[in-house]
Amino acid sequence: MCYIRPTESGVFKIEDCTWNTKTPFASIRRIVQDRKEIFRIRPGLWALEEYRSLLADRGIVAQDVTNSDSVQVQEFNHSYYQGLLLYIGNMKKLETYVPAQDKNRRCINVKLGEISTLTEVPPFSYQEFVNRSSTIDVMWFQPNSLGNEVMMPDSFFEVEHSTDIQNSLCKFSDLQSFNAQMFIVADARRHDEFIAKLNHDYFKPISDRVKFVSYDKLDRYYEGLMTQQKSSLVL
């Protein structure tokens, strides 16, 4: 199986081959866009055309106007971008958490529970707050030398492909007392909807704290971190 996707272990591992360019991801992106035998699954994620049907049987499908609202696409997007957020948090040396009900979902071929570093939400406050946060799609926590018991949340992320953004904003509102960043991750086409919901009077206390991150922007950020980590990319 061939996925064209930068990971922490590299891209296309081939012995005795070095990628001698300062912009490997831009070069890869240009190459795959010009090759008919390669198709785009998501921003930054490509595969060989000959595996399209096999990948679809495994729930990995290319999104287009005909299937963007299908259950298969929704489930894939949700777990895929949860996975990216976990990988990013790990690269930033933060502790990462994904809800218990999502641990067996996969980001391509890796279970989310195998990417996250925490198996339980750290007891950072009263149990009611801990319980409320436990269903947030991805959380990052600041490591603490004193142990998990005093670990505080760094960032909250909710991935919203087609579900109601307002539900996520309600979670953030309930957790506004904590000095954590708050993000809605979604298709760029939902930005106007995000602004409209956030402008509701109920969410005024958090209106300056919640940020919108598009799928494309998240992918570019991931690639940027990978570029910083590797002065040269081994293929």
Model features per residue range: what roles?
Residues E15, V32, L85-K93, L198-Y202:
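Hydrophobic, Leu/Ile/Phe/Ala-enriched alpha-helical segments that form helix-helix packing faces
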Residues S125-I136, N148-S214:
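Catalytic cores of nucleic-acid endonucleases
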Residues T18-V65:
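Charged low-complexity interaction tracts in eukaryotic proteins
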Residues D57-R106, E128:
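Nuclease catalytic cores
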Residues M1-P6, G10-F12:
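Positively charged, polyanion-binding regions of nucleic-acid-associated proteins
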Residues Y202-L235:
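Charged, structured surface patches that assemble and position nucleic-acid processing machinery
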Residues I108, D192-A196, Y222:
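Short, charged, surface-exposed secondary-structure boundary motifs
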Residues V73-Q74, N90, V98-M151, E223-V234:
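Active-site metal-binding core of divalent-cation-utilizing nuclease and nuclease-like domains
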